[in-house]
Amino acid sequence: MAKYHSSGKSSSMTAIAFLFILLITYTGTTDAQSGVCYGRLGNNLPTPQEVVALYNQANIRRMRIYGPSPEVLEALRGSNIELLLDIPNDNLRNLASSQDNANKWVQDNIKNYANNVRFRYVSVGNEVKPEHSFAQFLVPALENIQRAISNAGLGNQVKVSTAIDTGALAESFPPSKGSFKSDYRGAYLDGVIRFLVNNNAPLMVNVYSYFAYTANPKDISLDYALFRSPSVVVQDGSLGYRNLFDASVDAVYAALEKAGGGSLNIVVSESGWPSSGGTATSLDNARTYNTNLVRNVKQGTPKRPGAPLETYVFAMFDENQKQPEFEKFWGLFSPITKQPKYSINFN
């Protein structure tokens, strides 16, 4: 699932490197590097120091974490891993209420580590819904965090955004018809888009072909969801789609164009496939999806061909404290053995 960069030095192939050749070797432009989401809802996970070592050994150059953790941030010092750091939804009210609160958050969780931790993005909130009580605070929190980062002298290094999911779409088929739901736009999304355009920051989108497939298996084939279709499945004007992931991303691009955000880029902040516990879950399906995902995003989408799509694979480990059952099995690695669950070979 993760996107790994090859070192380009075959002579360094030690026993550890042989283990990780099972995982993705990726060479491409900087923006095409992919990361892995490091969720921590498990009681058997490796220590943060061990996790950072595993990222480095596997050549995973980008990480997403779902909230600031001093333990994790300390472990990242000097690692050269680029970080997507979330601000949890329950922090939005506090950060929107006061610039001082935002300044303190940035000082405590970014500035104090920025000399040797490579912060790439801050995601202010994750999958905020219009009905959430904190939705009204999202845009003010974005603005306050942006000012705090700029005041800390990090404005050229750290981009501020938020992550939505494809449930924000009113239409997604065909992709060119993509549009956002009016309640999302009214609650916060129009303000988010204006903010991102003004600050030249990407929109983050969690894209799960798994959920789209399991919600509608009559109309969506498993091959289309797993990037296995041998030919075009959806013809949308001059653009042909052979997989659901590209169609989903391009539907968001189309929706952005209709909402004044046509200049924005997308970062896929989560995507993956579970290996057990639910419909269409297996090691083979997880391996197939994630292998093909990493290959596919290097090339862009039909709407934006040749523009590599920065993507974060979900997730680094199986997390045994999540529910329902299938939510426990998205990991690339076993948390106990710290070994890959299946091979993904891009050589």
UniProtKB/Swiss-Prot annotation:
<dbReference type="InterPro" id="IPR044965">
    <property type="entry name" value="Glyco_hydro_17_plant"/>
</dbReference>
<dbReference type="GO" id="GO:0042973">
    <property type="term" value="F:glucan endo-1,3-beta-D-glucosidase activity"/>
</dbReference>
<keyword id="KW-0326">Glycosidase</keyword>
<protein>
    <recommendedName>
        <fullName>Glucan endo-1,3-beta-glucosidase</fullName>
        <ecNumber>3.2.1.39</ecNumber>
    </recommendedName>
</protein>
<dbReference type="InterPro" id="IPR017853">
    <property type="entry name" value="Glycoside_hydrolase_SF"/>
</dbReference>
<feature type="active site" description="Proton donor">
    <location>
        <position position="127"/>
    </location>
</feature>
<keyword id="KW-0611">Plant defense</keyword>
<feature type="active site" description="Nucleophile">
    <location>
        <position position="270"/>
    </location>
</feature>
<feature type="signal peptide">
    <location>
        <begin position="1"/>
        <end position="32"/>
    </location>
</feature>
<dbReference type="GO" id="GO:0005975">
    <property type="term" value="P:carbohydrate metabolic process"/>
</dbReference>
<dbReference type="InterPro" id="IPR000490">
    <property type="entry name" value="Glyco_hydro_17"/>
</dbReference>
<keyword id="KW-0378">Hydrolase</keyword>
<comment type="function">
    <text>Is thought to be an important plant defense-related product against fungal pathogens. Is capable of releasing soluble and highly active elicitor molecules from fungus cell walls.</text>
</comment>
<keyword id="KW-0926">Vacuole</keyword>
<dbReference type="Pfam" id="PF00332">
    <property type="entry name" value="Glyco_hydro_17"/>
</dbReference>
<comment type="similarity">
    <text>Belongs to the glycosyl hydrolase 17 family.</text>
</comment>
<dbReference type="GO" id="GO:0005773">
    <property type="term" value="C:vacuole"/>
</dbReference>
<dbReference type="GO" id="GO:0006952">
    <property type="term" value="P:defense response"/>
</dbReference>
<keyword id="KW-0732">Signal</keyword>
